[in-house]
């Protein structure tokens, strides 16, 4: 209640200012020519006239921008990865784009926005039991509608700094100006793309109209429609093998070995059939010796069934199932814009409907922006937005190998209201002060249409009765022994952010001082399942007269597993300050310091494998202290009158306290009450999100350079980073179909993936223009240095060493996942030719991965997936392999009678030819 009282005075003040000045504007308009005209003295202002795509080289922050993305043939992942310090969490099954800044990703670590509106969608993919599934935050937006991307690293201002730990990224969608040229009344924008190597069709059309009014204002309207198809059974580099068939030959050789060694069979290549190997002793003894053809056929079929059900999954190293990753999407964009003398507003609707395999993703976005600009002291901006996301899973969809018994639907709804005013003051001694005061209300909600009890860890059904864990005797039991409900898929809950923010920019001569601050009040509530072994235990927890007890009380059953809610609140203050100077075109230095926070998410606080064992609402907010130093260079006329040079170099150091990750260990207060079902079953360990005890340190530098001579141009980006950020226990898991019963308790459900950036990475582009700039020829080189991925092996933390203990008062062990280093990838070269026979009609042909190199994309979800291991005993001297294996012997520890061996088959796309056409008229 206290925050609402604070809000009222500011809201009334801003509303009063708005109404007063709006009335003033109307009166001034009616006065017309009667108004007196005041003649001001001439004011001479010298300022750099910098093109939009070059402004980053004069901005005293660690910022990057990319323009005209809708014209590009590059996918959004590659565009983001061309920005130093920025990356993406690539996932073929997510249907979204998930941005990474300096090794941090996800809601709150990176404030990913579309047209200034924070994106909160949480994508969760299904899995038949091989890879383990995946989940991640991101933006559901069609790149055909994106006009530009702005990335801010390590600092903040305005509403972009709300719940933003590492920085922000804003995807700007098309506006009327992008479609209607100059003073034209109508405009049309077309784009189409096709190609080889499983590149499907991609097309977009947008139409716009603008009408100029007598007052000088304009009204514009825009509608766009986009469709695309995505196929994933591409050919990898270095041989042309399809990714979906990778490892098939190896699997076939393993099958033959099994038939020969265990079945005493041999393959007759002439008949194409298996037959008895009469040289083997087995066929000399009864009953085998008297087998007729029918009995032999049955014998072969039994071996084939045993291979398919028990052994083939252990040797299957196919990285993906392309048939389950076929993607089709259709999107719409509608905008209505009014641009007046004093007032501006934009109303927009955007949707994207995506189907990936059997899963449907439906996103709807509504937004209204209003601006009132009257004088230097009144520049009022109002933004209201509503985002809705749905994921629909049909009956039979599987999560970590366990199927849904009924249709299942999850949803995410977000409401945002932002109000701010900017004032500019002319101070003595040629000093200028600009301030912005604002308030932001943000409500974010996650929910589902039902509680899927069939996904519970100990649920007993047909899908649970398979795999190695079932063969060895899995953990199971009725309500009298174990909680039956789990919150592993889409935890439900709500978040409320109430934020006051203030920006100030002081400018004098060549110096500039910027300061931004905000205070965030955070309230949350989420669902979890309780477990009470008796009526008395339930009564003691809530009281006999409580609504909860009355709602769930059932004296006949004696065991209670109610779905309950738990609430909490937190608060944080954030600051960002920077100082810069403009000593000339060649040297514009800047330095900044920021303290930022990230609030725990619903998924971190309410995920739970068993009952409420994973619930942890006492998580502390993450806190980052970031120092940055850098300089800009922007010079026009370096070697000739109209060439331009842009350079930005930034070094940074960051320390993060209370880093949130999930660990495997005991979750209860060791000095408090021990859960009754723990003491009776001995199942003392589970996955829970916790604050990392050590501080996380990051440091690195980022370079961005652009030189344009006219005939010749080049772009260079390069980033280097070292980080001590820990992994999550859920970053890698055993394959569900091959897990032992112990490993079934350690399934990570695809909750997370490694997010640490490659040690270094970069991109160099060189091009030249001919035929009066109608023909552009160019090429780009992509470089990825050493990177890491998670393995299934455990790393013990918090002073533990892996020793188990039956004493429930002792910590025992806490573990996350080990990592292994992926070597520097080969250089990847792309080539393109663009021809513009008439203005704004562009044909572009290009070759991706020109030399057909075989390489791995860093931070691809498939790198950490369970498909990148095979699960069986093996002979280390065995050379019958066609996969790249890790030589680290610590990964082959023979646990549970077998070995988890690491492989590398998740290769990126090989040589691909693309053709793009875009036309604007």
From Swiss-Prot:
GO terms for biological process: siderophore transmembrane transport. One of its GO terms (cellular component) is cell outer membrane. Pfam families: Plug, TonB_dep_Rec_b-barrel. Residues 1-25 form the signal peptide. It comes from the Bacteria. A motif (TonB C-terminal box) lies at residues 904-921. One of its GO terms (molecular function) is siderophore uptake transmembrane transporter activity. Residues 53-174 form the TBDR plug domain. InterPro entries: Plug_dom, Plug_dom_sf, TonB-dep_rcpt-like, TonB-dep_rcpt_b-brl, TonB_rcpt_b-brl_sf, TonB_rcpt_CS. This is Probable TonB-dependent receptor NMB1497.
């Amino acid at each position: 209640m206290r925050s609402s009282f604070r809000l009222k005075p500011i809201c009334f003040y801003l509303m009063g200012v708005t109404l007063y000045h709006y009335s003033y504007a109307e009166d001034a308009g009616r006065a017309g020519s009667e108004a007196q005209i005041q003649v001001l003295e001439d004011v001479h202002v010298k300022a750099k006239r910098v093109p939009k795509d070059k402004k980053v080289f004069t901005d005293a922050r660690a910022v990057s921008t990319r323009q005209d993305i809708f014209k590009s043939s590059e996918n959004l992942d590659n565009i983001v990865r061309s920005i130093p310090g920025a990356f993406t969490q690539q996932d073929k099954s997510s249907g979204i784009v998930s941005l990474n800044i300096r090794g941090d990703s996800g809601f709150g670590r990176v404030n990913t926005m579309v047209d200034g509106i924070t994106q909160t969608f949480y994508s969760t993919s299904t899995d038949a039991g091989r890879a383990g599934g995946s989940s991640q935050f991101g933006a559901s937006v069609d790149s055909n509608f994106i006009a530009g991307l702005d990335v801010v690293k390590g600092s903040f201002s305005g509403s972009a700094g709300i719940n933003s730990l590492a920085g922000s990224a804003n995807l700007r969608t098309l506006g009327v100006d992008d479609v209607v040229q100059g003073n034209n009344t109508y405009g049309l924008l077309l784009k189409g793309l096709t190609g080889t190597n499983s590149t499907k069709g991609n097309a977009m059309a947008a139409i716009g109209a603008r009408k100029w009014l007598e007052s000088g204002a304009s009204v514009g309207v825009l509608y766009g429609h986009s469709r695309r198809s995505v196929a994933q059974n591409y050919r990898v580099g270095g041989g042309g093998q399809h990714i979906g068939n990778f490892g098939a030959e190896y699997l076939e050789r393993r099958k033959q070995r099994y038939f020969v060694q265990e079945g005493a069979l041999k393959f007759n290549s002439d008949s194409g059939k298996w037959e008895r190997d009469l040289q083997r002793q087995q066929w000399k003894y009864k009953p085998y010796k008297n087998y007729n053809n029918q009995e032999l056929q049955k014998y072969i079929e039994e071996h084939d069934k045993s291979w398919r059900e028990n052994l083939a999954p252990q040797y299957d190293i196919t990285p993906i199932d392309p048939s389950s990753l076929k993607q089709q999407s259709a999107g719409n964009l509608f905008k209505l814009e009014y641009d007046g003398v004093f007032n501006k507003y934009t109303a927009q609707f955007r949707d994207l409907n995506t189907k990936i395999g059997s899963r449907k993703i439906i996103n709807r976005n509504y937004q209204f922006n209003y601006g009132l600009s009257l004088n230097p002291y009144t520049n009022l901006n109002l933004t209201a937005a509503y985002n809705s996301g749905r994921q629909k899973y049909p009956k039979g969809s599987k999560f970590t190998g366990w199927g849904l018994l009924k249709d299942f639907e999850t949803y995410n709804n977000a409401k945002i209201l932002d109000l701010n005013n900017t004032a500019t003051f002319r101070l003595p001694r040629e000093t200028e002060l600009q301030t912005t005061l604002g308030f932001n209300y943000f409500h974010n909600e996650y929910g589902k249409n039902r509680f899927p009890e069939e996904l519970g860890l100990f649920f007993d059904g047909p899908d649970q009765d398979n795999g190695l864990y079932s063969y060895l005797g899995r953990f199971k039991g009725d309500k009298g022994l174990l909680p039956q409900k789990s919150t592993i898929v889409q935890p439900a809950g709500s978040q409320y952010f109430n934020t006051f923010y203030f920006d100030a920019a002081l400018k004098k001569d060549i110096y500039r001082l910027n300061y931004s601050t905000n205070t965030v009040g955070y309230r949350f509530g989420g669902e979890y399942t309780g477990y009470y072994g008796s009526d008395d235990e339930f009564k003691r927890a809530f009281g006999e007269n409580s609504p909860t007890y009355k709602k769930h009380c059932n004296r006949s059953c004696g065991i209670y597993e109610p779905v309950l809610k738990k609430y909490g609140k937190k608060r944080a203050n954030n600051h960002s300050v920077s100082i810069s100077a403009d000593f000339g075109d060649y040297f514009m230095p800047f330095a900044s310091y920021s303290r930022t926070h990230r609030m725990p998410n619903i998924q971190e606080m309410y995920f739970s494998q068993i009952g409420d064992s994973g619930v942890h609402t006492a998580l502390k907010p993450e806190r980052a202290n970031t120092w940055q130093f850098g300089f800009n260079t922007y010079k026009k006329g370096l070697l000739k009158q109209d060439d331009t040079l842009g350079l930005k170099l930034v070094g940074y150091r960051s320390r993060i306290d209370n880093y949130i990750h999930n660990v495997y260990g005991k979750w209860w207060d060791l000095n408090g009450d021990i859960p009754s079902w723990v003491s009776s079953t001995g199942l003392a360990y589970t996955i829970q999100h916790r604050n990392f005890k050590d501080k996380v340190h990051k440091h690195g530098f980022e370079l961005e350079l652009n030189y344009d001579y006219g005939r010749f141009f080049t772009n260079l980006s390069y980033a280097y980073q070292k980080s001590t950020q820990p992994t999550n226990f859920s970053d890698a898991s055993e394959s569900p179909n091959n897990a032992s019963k112990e490993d079934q308790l350690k399934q990570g459900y695809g909750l997370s993936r490694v997010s640490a950036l490659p040690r270094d990475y970069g991109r160099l582009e060189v091009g030249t223009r001919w035929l009066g700039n109608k023909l552009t020829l160019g090429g780009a080189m992509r470089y990825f240095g050493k990177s890491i991925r998670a393995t299934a092996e455990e790393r013990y933390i918090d002073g533990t060493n892996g020793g188990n203990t039956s004493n429930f008062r002792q910590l025992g062990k806490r573990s996350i996942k080990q990592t292994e280093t992926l070597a520097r990838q080969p250089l990847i070269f792309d080539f393109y030719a663009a021809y513009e026979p008439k203005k704004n009609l562009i044909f572009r042909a290009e070759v991706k991965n020109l030399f057909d190199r075989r390489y791995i994309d860093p931070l691809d979800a498939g790198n950490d997936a369970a498909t990148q291991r095979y699960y069986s005993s093996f002979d280390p001297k065995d050379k019958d392999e066609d996969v790249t294996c890790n030589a680290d012997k610590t990964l082959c520890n023979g646990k549970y009678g077998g070995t988890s061996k690491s492989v590398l088959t998740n290769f990126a796309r090989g040589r691909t030819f693309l053709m793009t056409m875009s036309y604007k008229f």
